[in-house]
């Protein structure tokens, strides 16, 4: 997990103070299966998605952000000038604050607000720390490792049996499709990339 620039208002707040503060988790799977992985922002949506809506002149759904006056807005330009909101209200806000603390002050680095102040309008990438925890299941489980890994697979199978999908399943499917068919991008992005290539 890591902070970013301060682009997100805390639950009940009206101006940016927190970062999008992504959180990721990975779990190995046997027999050559891709790992169980999720990686998501603690904001209602990633800032990049707001930027894509802005580029395509598309409104954003209610609940993604507020304008600089703290009013809910569906205008991506207003939200980019205001603040994103956390996902899940106070729960998402609490997770975001936790990430600020453990990947900022706890490791001797900046918070998202401090990163944005340090940037001083330069528009550079966030200046932040990262906290990565890696655990070796064999150290916890020893000779029972395979039994417990099988229990994890049972959990995954039970989720899929209900018609739900695992986080990252869609990503793996999209990756396979892209490897076969290439990528598709909006015409507006193609035009922008073409323009940049001519510079």
Describe the function of each predicted region:
Residues 1-5:
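Short, acidic/small-residue loops that bind anionic groups at enzyme active sites
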Residues 42-45, 91, 137-139:
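Glycine-rich beta-alpha junction loops
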Residues 46-108, 125:
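Small-residue-enriched flexible segments
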């Amino acid at each position: 997990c890591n902070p970013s620039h301060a682009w997100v208002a805390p639950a009940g707040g009206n101006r940016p103070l927190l970062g999008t503060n992504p959180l990721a988790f990975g779990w190995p799977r046997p027999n050559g299966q891709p790992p169980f992985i999720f990686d998501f922002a603690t904001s209602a949506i990633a800032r990049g998605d707001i930027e894509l809506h802005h580029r395509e002149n598309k409104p954003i759904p209610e609940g993604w952000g507020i304008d600089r006056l703290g009013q809910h807005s569906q205008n991506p330009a207003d939200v980019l000038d205001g603040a994103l909101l956390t996902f899940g209200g106070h729960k998402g806000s609490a997770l975001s604050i936790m990430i600020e603390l453990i990947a900022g002050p706890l490791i001797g680095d900046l918070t998202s607000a401090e990163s944005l102040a340090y940037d001083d309008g330069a528009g550079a990438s966030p200046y932040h720390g990262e906290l990565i925890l890696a655990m070796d299941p064999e150290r916890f489980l020893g000779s029972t490792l395979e039994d417990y890994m099988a229990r994890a697979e049972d959990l995954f199978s039970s989720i899929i049996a209900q018609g739900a999908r695992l986080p990252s399943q869609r990503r793996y499917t999209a990756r396979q499709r892209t490897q076969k068919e290439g990528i598709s991008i909006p015409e507006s992005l193609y035009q922008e990339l073409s323009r940049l290539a001519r510079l």
